[in-house]
């Protein structure tokens, strides 16, 4: 049975009332439109749905606004939150007059990256295993006006609430700053909430394996089992969707901001990657039982600081990428060592041999981030880029002279965009990314840089008001 036939059968079996077609904007925010299920038949999956592309930031001008969404029948699932039974499906964006993929469609770049891998002859499939962290709060307020620039967060579980007064008393069990990794409840107060999130994902057909409290106060992570590049990018969007909505049902609010508060660890999105061509391409007899291709793949990722513009695309990303908070700052690699940008997780099975990029964060558009990482790695294999010797020391404690010899990740979104402007040819291979797409993306991100740089910050009042 075809994927379209499977989707239509699911609609019938589940007595679906509506079909929610979904796609992402360049920043990675999920967008949707809901159709009456009676309008969705076999032809719909081929002909798609017209929409106004000029209303999506960074896409079409109003005089060329018509765009078309083509549903991917292999991506369907039943929405767990809507009151009426609704089938959801992820879409690719195409030009209505030619039927060709729209050059700025993020999902289209992911699909093309997978096709490019196969066409290159290097591998048949790339597997991705992202690990996205997040914070759960009870109350978040912020203001950005000429007279007030401020934010305030609160959570009963927050380490700062040890002396707060509560109507039923302060029970005092909390994860302290940098003290949240793995204690049981009552310190881990979100056990049941995370369990509900994970169970919801299972009911949607997602492959999951675990959940736990993370290092920072109020910080958490759920585990996704690895899958194909586009599939896992879809899953990260579903992951965020479920977490936001389950938290909201319990009066909580979630953020995937990389660094929502000072003085504690930020949220990363570590990305595990492997390539298969009949067998695991990364298993071998080199360092850490890696193959030569795996080392070149690492070399490609470490060579390209411009990747940061796609894997760490927020001004806030670079408040996480600083020493002292378990975030990778140095462009180095090691087996098991978590202080470098790339880690080789220990495993007994050659089939599980993989590399882990530790610098990405969950503010990234997963389609663009995963495609960029794959393209950088493939560029490393094609050009046999040597990653240099592994760094098996604690990179956080290196003496200054050794530290100075190791290149770093970008220090700001401005720097990352400048690197991307200078060096992006590896992304253009196979037309996976296009110049038009990168230019549109960078224009949006430069707007964010200017907004951030031109807004006075409260700490500037603390440091300079009395000058």
From Swiss-Prot:
Modified residues (O-AMP-tyrosine): 396
GO terms under biological process: glutamine biosynthetic process; nitrogen fixation; nitrogen utilization
Binding residues annotated for ATP, in chain numbering: 209, 272-274, 338, 343
Entry EC no(s): 6.3.1.2
Function recorded in the entry: Catalyzes the ATP-dependent biosynthesis of glutamine from glutamate and ammonia.
Required cofactor names: Mg(2+)
Name of the protein this chain belongs to: Glutamine synthetase
SMART domains, A to Z: Gln-synt_C
Cofactor note: Binds 2 Mg(2+) ions per subunit.
Regulation of this protein's activity per its record: The activity of this enzyme could be controlled by adenylation under conditions of abundant glutamine.
Catalytic activity, reaction form: L-glutamate + NH4(+) + ATP = L-glutamine + ADP + phosphate + H(+)
CC annotations in GO: cytoplasm; membrane
GS beta-grasp domain residues: 14-98
Binding site for L-glutamate: 265-266, 320, 326, 338, 358
Subunit note: Oligomer of 12 subunits arranged in the form of two hexameric ring.
Alphabetized NCBIfam families for the sequence: GlnA
Subcellular location: Cytoplasm
Family, per entry: Belongs to the glutamine synthetase family.
Keywords: ATP-binding, Cytoplasm, Ligase, Magnesium, Metal-binding, Nitrogen fixation, Nucleotide-binding, Phosphoprotein
Organism in which the protein naturally occurs: Cereibacter sphaeroides (Rhodobacter sphaeroides)
Residue ranges of every copy of the GS catalytic domain listed in the record: 106-467
Any Pfam family matching the protein: Gln-synt_C
Binding site for Mg(2+) 2: 133, 214, 221
MF (Gene Ontology): ATP binding; glutamine synthetase activity; metal ion binding
Residues noted as binding Mg(2+) 1 in the record, renumbered to the chain: 131, 270, 356
Keyword Cell cycle: no
